[in-house]
Amino acid sequence: MMRIIQGDLSDPRVAGLLHIHLSTARAQTAPGSAHALDVSGLQSPDISFWTIWNDEALLGFGALKRLSKEHGEVKSMHVAQSMRRKGTGRAILHHIIATARANGMSRLSLETGSWEYFLPARALYRSHGFTECPPFADYVPDPNSVFMSLDLHRRAP
């Protein structure tokens, strides 16, 4: 049974999957267009980071960055390769959306890659009501990025 808990960045299993996440993001994105957070970025006080487990097996992780009182950003969504297309990403995204709503946010945005590798991620986000939007926060237009946003006042996915 899957369980979502606050992420422990000192856990070697988490560090290992984070290394895979960062390496993959850099390999699948044009230079200068990867916006994945490293350990120090995930330790920022405006970031909440969660891991998802099945018993002692780490399945993935995700984070929520508070941009303002009403606006949050989905960050660092990653699911272990062997656990993709099994509901893991959906579970962590549901958790992030529910947490944003519970914290009074009205909008949730994200940046993901525009390359084919990121098609499944974009499909997951669309299935939860995210739609493409202009760059937000400190992002600038980038052909290697797709920006998406969700109105949290809409019905829960």
Locate the predicted segments by residue:
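Short low-complexity, flexible loop/linker segments enriched in glycine and/or proline
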Residues: 124-125, 148-150
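Short hydrophobic/aromatic beta-strand or adjacent loop that forms the aromatic wall/cage
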Residues: 47, 143-147
